[in-house]
């Protein structure tokens, strides 16, 4: 099941005897665990009715699950970093423990709710995982898509007494990224910045939000297209100073140039910005800006810019160009292509 189905079940009081929480979206995963705790554990008796075990063997896990709850219907047994689901088990015989648990979990106790909390994905080849697929609820916590993230942001801001327009929300996601832990911190900052004003504005995001590397490279590419050499080199130096690798930045810059070329071609075919965004998998907010900018450039110029980045990356990797200064040389070439309209 996905996280939405899990939250629905918990709200209705439908609690399974055993769960596996897996997937890369840690914020929602932790929220799900908090919701389960709140549903299962009486206030004031949480510590008495929860066992937290790190990579336990079968005996330790079974002992915790068999312990009766105190003034509660169920006891929560949280299993962290189980080597029987991911990684390599230590300090015990994995095969023996997995076999014992597979047998035990065919008929888990009604007085316990066992949660295997896995960072990232469980190893599907493990014997225990194969058994859990039959007897437990596997809950997948995958990254939210843009629509889900927009709803999540609106809900968080509503709790703070704020609101945000859809285009501004798209700008926020593109600027700050899709990590919900980071976004939750940015939302608190935005709410504080807005003060008594109810609506979060685009300029609030520009003023206080921490920008992702991808956004900063996008900003660098746009600055180059505007011909603002001074600002472009200021941005590139800041990226290098913050520890970003030159080859990584070249690859991102190449991606931005290729994306701008795609926008140019699709614009020429009569497509509108939102349709282009869906086709090339780019944020609508960014595509709407590119849509206006690429009108000032020929297809040849944009092709030459993308090729320039590719050539530099190849020359650096093949040892024909020194890594130091490669980004700056590429930027100078892009500025020349902008002015001359040829490579």
Model-derived segments and their meaning:
Residues 1-343:
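Conserved beta/loop motifs at nucleotide-recognition and modification sites
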């Amino acid at each position: 099941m996905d996280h939405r189905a899990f939250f629905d079940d918990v709200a209705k009081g439908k609690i399974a005897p055993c769960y596996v929480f897996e997937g890369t979206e840690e914020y929602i995963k932790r929220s799900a665990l908090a919701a389960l705790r709140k549903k299962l554990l009486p206030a004031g008796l949480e510590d008495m009715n929860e066992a937290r075990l790190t990579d336990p063997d079968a005996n330790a896990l079974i002992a915790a699950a068999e312990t009766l709850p105190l003034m509660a219907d169920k006891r929560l047994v949280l299993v962290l970093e189980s080597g029987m689901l991911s990684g390599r088990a230590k300090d015990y015989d994995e095969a023996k423990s997995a076999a014992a648990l597979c047998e035990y979990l065919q008929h888990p106790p009604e007085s316990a709710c066992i949660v295997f909390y896995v960072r990232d994905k469980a190893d599907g080849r493990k014997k225990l995982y194969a058994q859990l697929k039959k007897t437990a609820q596997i809950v997948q916590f995958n990254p939210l898509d843009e629509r889900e993230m927009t709803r999540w942001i609106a809900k968080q801001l509503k709790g703070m007494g704020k609101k945000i327009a859809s285009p501004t929300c798209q700008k926020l996601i593109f600027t700050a990224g899709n990590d919900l832990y980071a976004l939750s911190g940015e939302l608190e900052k935005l709410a504080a910045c807005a003060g008594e004003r109810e609506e979060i504005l685009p300029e609030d995001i520009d003023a206080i939000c921490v920008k992702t590397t991808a956004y900063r490279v996008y900003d660098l590419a746009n600055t180059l297209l505007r011909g603002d050499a001074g600002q472009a080199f200021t941005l590139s130096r800041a990226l290098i100073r913050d520890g970003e690798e030159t080859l990584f930045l070249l690859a991102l810059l190449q991606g931005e140039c290729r994306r701008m070329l795609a926008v140019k071609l699709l614009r020429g075919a009569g497509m509108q910005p939102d349709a282009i965004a869906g086709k090339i998998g780019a944020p609508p907010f960014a595509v709407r800006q590119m849509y206006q900018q690429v009108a000032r450039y020929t297809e040849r110029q944009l092709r030459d810019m993308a090729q320039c980045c590719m050539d530099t990356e190849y020359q650096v990797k093949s040892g024909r160009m020194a890594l130091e200064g490669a980004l700056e040389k590429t930027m100078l070439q892009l500025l020349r292509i902008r002015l001359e309209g040829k490579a």
